[in-house]
Amino acid sequence: MSYRTRFGKDNSACDSGNAVEGSGSSKGPNEVSNDFDHEIAQLTKHRSRPHQLLSQDMPGKSRLLVSTMKMLVGRESNHSGRGRFSSADGCHVLSRYLPINGPWGVDQSTSPAYVSQFSNDGLFFVAGFQGGHIRIYNVDKGWKVQKDILTKSLRWTITDTSLSPDQRYLVYASMTPIVNIVNVGSSMTESLANVTEIHEGLDFSVGGDEDEFGIFSVRFSTDGRELVAASRDASIYVYDLQANKVNLRIPAHSSDVNTVCFADETGHLIYSGSDDNLCKVWDRRCFNHKGQPAGVLMGHLEGVTFIDSRGDGRYFISNGKDQTTQLWDIRKMSSRAMYSPRLRDHDWDYRWMEYPAHAKTLKHPNDQSLATYRGHGVLRTLIRCYLSPAYSTGQKYIYTGSSDHCVYIYDLVTGAQVARLNHHEGPVRDCSWHPLYPMLVSSSWDGTIARWEFPGDDQVPTLERPRARRKERLL
C-alpha cells in the first residue's frame, strides 16, 4: 500500500486535540509559559491555522482545532474560495497525525548507528554506522538499499554525513581532517572505497598544519557548492568544492565545535555550537579574519551538541549536555560572551557519568534563549534535535534523540511533551522525520534503524527489541 493511501486515513483520536503518546506524554518541567507570545509562537500558529471560514463555528468565534472531516467538507464545498487547501490548512490536518506507531525495522547492524537522515524530498534515507558502513535506502521502493558504501580513512566512527541538494554526492566525516565525497548517483550498488568506486578525500587542514583533528559535523550549502564543517580544533571550516580547497577557517570557539549549519538558503549566516557552552552566529558578508562572530547566545550550562536552523536566518534550536533543548532568536544575541559561572563543584564527563541531579533545574544567569525543553537525556554521545517538517507540521514540534533510548517530541509553543517513542536498547543519537509524510526513523547504538508511522494501518510492527549489549561504547 502506498504512503499516500495509508496516510490519507482519518483517525478520530487525532481530532480530539489530546496529547498522543508512543509510550507516554506529559507537560514536563519545560520553561515555556502558557502565554508564550513571542513572534515565533505566532508564526508557528499561523503556519497551521486553517482558513477562518473553516474554523468558525459561529460568527466571531474561532475553534482552535477543526476536525479533519469538517476540513474536507469545507474544501469540497469551496468555503475558502480557493477550491483546495492552503499550506496552513494542510498543516492543520497533517500536524495532528504523529508518527508514533511501530516500530518497523529498516535495518539491523552489529555496529552502533550514528547518523540517519532523509533526503530533502524524502525519496532516500541515509544511515551511517560506526563500523564504517553507510547505506542509502530508496524509500519509495520498499526501503531497498540503493547504495551500500564501505568507507575509508575512518577513525573511531562516522561522525556525520551530508547528501548534496541534487542527491548525486554524499560526504562523510570521521575523527580526521579528511572528508570523503562519493558519487552516489552511479548505477553501482556496492561502493567500496577506491576499489569499486573512487572516494575522493577533501583535506580540511590548512597552512601546512600537521596537527590532526576530527570533524564532528559537515553540511552542504543549499547550492551544493560549499561544505561547512565543525572540528575538534575549535574551528569552523568552509570548503569550496569548485576550487577544491578550504576558503575560510574561523577560530570560532575556545573548545571543540560539535555542530555547525547554514542559517538559510543564502549561505551568508552560519550557526555554531561548542563545548564552551556557547552558540555563535557568523556573518560572512562582514567577516574579519580575527574570528569575531556577529553575535553570541548564552543559556546552555554545558556543551552544545547539535544545532538545527528553522531555515529563516532568524530562529534555531540547540541540544546541550545540560540535558535541555533551547530555542533561540538571533536578534537577542550579544556582541560578546559574558562571564559563565561554574555551577558544579566537581569534574563531570557526559560520556560516562550521570548528570548531577541538583543541576537539572539550574538556569544560566544571562540566559538569552526564548524557551527551554526538558525530559530527554543528552549523555554518552552528541545527541541531535530537530524542528519538525514545515510542509506537514508547520515546524510546530521539536523532536530529539535521547540517551535513555527514546525519541521525544515536544510542542514548540506550549512546551508539552506530546510523545515519547520507546523501543531501543541503546542511546538514540539521531532521528529524522519524513519531509512529507507522518513517518519518523530513529537510529540507535543498539545497531537498529527503526521506522515509526502514524497509527491507522493494519500492519503489525515487525521489529522486536534487540538484545542488550554487554558493553556500551562512548564518543
UniProtKB/Swiss-Prot annotation:
Repeat region (WD), residues: 211-240, 252-283, 299-329, 375-411, 423-453
Pfam family, one: WD40
InterPro entries the UniProt entry points to: DCAF, DCAF11/LEC14B, WD40/YVTN_repeat-like_dom_sf, WD40_repeat_dom_sf, WD40_rpt
UniProt KW keywords: Repeat, WD repeat
Keyword Repeat part of the UniProt annotation: yes
Family of this protein: Belongs to the WD repeat LEC14B family.
A GO CC term attached to the entry: Cul4-RING E3 ubiquitin ligase complex
Signal peptide: none
Taxonomic lineage: Eukaryota, Viridiplantae, Streptophyta, Embryophyta, Tracheophyta
Biased composition (Polar residues): 23-33
Name of the protein in question: LEC14B homolog
Region Disordered: start-end pairs: 1-34
Organism this protein belongs to: Prunus armeniaca (Apricot)
One BP annotation, GO: proteasome-mediated ubiquitin-dependent protein catabolic process
